[in-house]
Structure formats: C-alpha cells, structure tokens
Amino acid sequence: MFYKEKFPENIQEGVWDEKSCVRRQCGYVIDETDLPSEKKWLEKGAPLAIKEDGKVKVCKTAKAYEAAVKSATELKVYKGHLFAVNDKVAGSTISAIDTSNNDYDKLTISALAEKADKDAVLDDGDAAKVIGLNYATVYLDGMQSCTPTLQAYEIEEETLPYPLSDAVKVALTSRHAFKI
C-alpha cells in the first residue's frame, strides 16, 4: 500500500490578506529540474517565473550574509536558499557551495559583476519573468501544477519562504503590496 504525504511539516509559508488575493486563471506546471531532488514541497509565497515553454520555475533568491566587493569570487549568503552548483546568482555562475558553517553558505562564483551589500537580496536573473507568488503549498511529485497570485495585499514579507529582491518586487507590480 502506498501512502502519500498530504501535509508538510515545519514549512514556512507566506502570509497575506486572503480576501485581497486574486489567483491567476489556470494552473501552471512546475519545472522541477533545477530544484534540489530532496525538496518535497513548494511553499506558499515562493516567487514563480514564467519560462518560454509555459511552465513556471522558482526564481531563486538569497540574502547576502556579508558585503562582497565587485569582482569577488566568494559570496556568503544566509542558509535557506535553493541555489546549486552551476546556477547563476547576481550574474555570476556558482562553481562550489560550502555548507560547513551553521550561519551561512559560502558560494564560490565567477567574478561578481557588481558589489553586494550586507543583507542585499540577490536573484538568479529571472526576476523580470516573475508572474506571481505561489498561492498554496504543493507537493512536488514530478508533474505538479501550481497557481500563481495575480494580486495580493498586506504581504508579510518576513513570512515568505525566500527573500524577494527589488527586481522581483518590481515584476510583481503594484498589484502586490507589502505590509508596512
């Protein structure tokens, strides 16, 4: 007998005013190819970017643990990101990830194109393609679909599963407002 897990445990989900939320008209198939294989759930509030084939992918983001100068080849980011080797972050390709520190991960990257301030949120370059936030947590089983938000107000940013870069916020447009 096969039992399918129905509810995630210990997962951070985004919080917003549900009455103000408008979902997109249909579901989108999630491209799971660049997500960690051990990831079982896509959290409510994850930023979703549209791909050319019509699928959506998570727009990966990370918050800088400390400042990095232009041309740096190492970048420290807070834990909890989805980046992997060969991904791009802030325009630079990741060649290695050191996870040995309890507070941050150290990314070895090609030369950083621009400086990164402490606590700056960096993305994978797909921020302009973001079409919404994941409306509800979904189980990732290979062909899962999700529904992005079209509008949401009073978003409590600190509850989102991943930090949002300024570029992601611009892509979300004025139909997504954050709680002050």
What does each of the following model-derived ranges do?
Residues M1-I180:
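Surface-exposed, low-hydrophobicity beta-strand/loop segments enriched in small/polar/acidic residues
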